[in-house]
Amino acid sequence: MGPVLVWNISDLIGMNFTCLKGLATLFKTGASIGISLGAGAECSTIIACNLGSWFFKISLAIVQRLPLGMQCRICSFRNARQGGNIPELALIIICTFIYFLYFSLF
């Protein structure tokens, strides 16, 4: 199953190279869950998460390209298996976990 990610077309306007690489990674992995991390008002970088063996490897590979002081930002995501929206609380928990994991390892 391919990636199921819903975003506004305005999110793609003005994307820098890092953001585009993150988006490309999302499609390559066929992830069913996406997490949007951004720094302030800058464009969001897509982190592809399969919640499986590739979860940490893919996440950290893209998190490393984000600037310090990044902030989590919730966009529109869909869970491919349930076919519904992922609860915002779950996204915040996952996003916060990756945030602290990044700063504890690096």
Curated annotation (Swiss-Prot):
Note: Partially overlaps AST1.
Keywords: Membrane, Transmembrane, Transmembrane helix
Name of the featured protein: Putative uncharacterized protein YBL070C
One of the record's GO cellular component terms: membrane
Origin species: Saccharomyces cerevisiae (strain ATCC 204508 / S288c) (Baker's yeast)
Membrane topology: Multi-pass membrane protein
Subcellular location: Membrane
Residues annotated as transmembrane: 43-63, 86-106
Entry annotated with the keyword Transmembrane helix: yes
